[in-house]
Amino acid sequence: MSLDDLDQTMRDYADAVRSGAAAGQGWPEWINIPSKIGQVAAVRIYARDQREQAMRDGQLIVAVCPGLVDTRASRPWFTDMSQAQSPGQAAIDVVKLDTGPIDTQMYGELVQHGRIIPWTEPAAIPN
C-alpha cells in the first residue's frame, strides 16, 4: 500500500460518511477510530518507504499515541477525565523519543509511553 492508496481509502471513507453509507460499508460509528487508524497507517507506510535513509541518518520515525489528554477538544467526548494527562505531561514522552537514544525496534511502530503498542499481529505493510 502506498500513501496515495491510503489517501484514496480515507477519501472514500469521508465520502461514505458524508453520504450516510459508512455504517453499511462496515466503518465504525465513531469517526475518531478510522481517522487514528489512517494516521498510524500513514506513518507506518512513510517509515517503511524511508527506512534505509532514516537509518543512515540516525532518524527514528514512529507514530505516537500519548493516551488520553485533557484538552478542550477531548472533554466533550469523555465523561471521566480523571486519568487524563495534561498536554505538558503528554509531551514528555514525545520529547524523550526525540532527544533520547534511538531504539530501532520502535522504528515504524505505534508507541505510547515509551512502549510499542501492537498494531495487529506483526505484519509487513505490502508495497
Indicate residue ranges for each PLM-predicted region.
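A short C-terminal helix-loop "cap" of Rossmann-like NAD(P)-dependent dehydrogenase/epimerase domains
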Residues: 16-23, 68-72, 88-92
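C-terminal helical subdomain
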Residues: 63, 71, 78-127
